[in-house]
Amino acid sequence: VLLQDFEIEFIIPIFMLAIGIGAYIGLEPIARVNNMFMPLAGIVLLLSLILLIPYFNINNIFPILGNGVYSITVKGINTISLFSDILLLNILLPYCENTSEAKKSGWRAIYISATIGVVILLSYCLIYPYPVSREFMIPVYQLSRVIHLGNFFSRFEVIFQFVWSILVLIYSSIYVYALCYVWQITFDLKYYKPLILPVVIISGIVAVLPSSVVDLVKSERLENIIVYPVAFLLPILFGFYSKKIYNKRTVNEES
């Protein structure tokens, strides 16, 4: 709805410029903007869920397990990217002065995010019957299109798109910052800011590579199958290896 008359080649550079500025100003300003904007996003989400209640149909959630436990547990591994933000929390942990408080905040964020995700998924399943509910992209946007308050107010998705755009900018800025930070410590660089421009340019080029929604879905599924399992497995392996080295050093020092 927003900027629908503009070409994607015009919209993406604007987004990438805003993301680059966010990554350049640093983590603390991004966190402050996030703290100011999150209450508004929460109010919009809560209002959306309340307005969706008249459209709920309890019969739509059946069958509860869909195609069975196997499809949920084994085939559900393809959606492991939903938990990729946990890796980001570990990357940003060194910025926290109080590690114990940071861990509590991290767990709190995971619980809140999980609760919101369950509520959104439940609302989606209560509105869209099975098997239509199996295939969805940006479910909150699809839910917002259902809301109609008479002829006067029938485009609630406009509000969602505004809030979603700001959240994407904040989210992407944090990831670009984290990526540049990881490269900084990996290659022992003095500053991370010179890395922002090439990262933003490469990200913008990759964003325009899919020629259609079908290609985008295919690339996303490929990432979920190959990239994210490796991304989760490597920290676990390095963790076990580091613990083994630490225990060996402790034994040598004691002996």
Predicted features by range, described:
Residues 1-9, 14-18:
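Membrane helical hairpin/interfacial module
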Residues 1-6, 97-116, 175-199:
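Helix-loop-helix connectors at the membrane interface of multi-pass transporters/channels
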Residues 9-10, 22-51, 223-234:
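Membrane-interface loop-to-helix entry segments
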Residues 11-16, 24, 51-55, 64-116, ...:
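Hydrophobic, membrane-embedded alpha-helices of multi-pass small-molecule transporters
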Residues 19-20, 39-53, 107-133, 194-210:
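Selective recognition of specific alpha-helical transmembrane segments in multi-pass small-molecule
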Residues 20-23, 40-65, 125, 237-250:
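Hydrophobic alpha-helical segments and their helix-loop junctions in multi-pass secondary transporters
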Residues 127-157:
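Membrane-interface interhelical connector segments
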Residues 188-193, 208-228:
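Extracellular/periplasmic helix-loop-helix junctions in multi-pass membrane proteins
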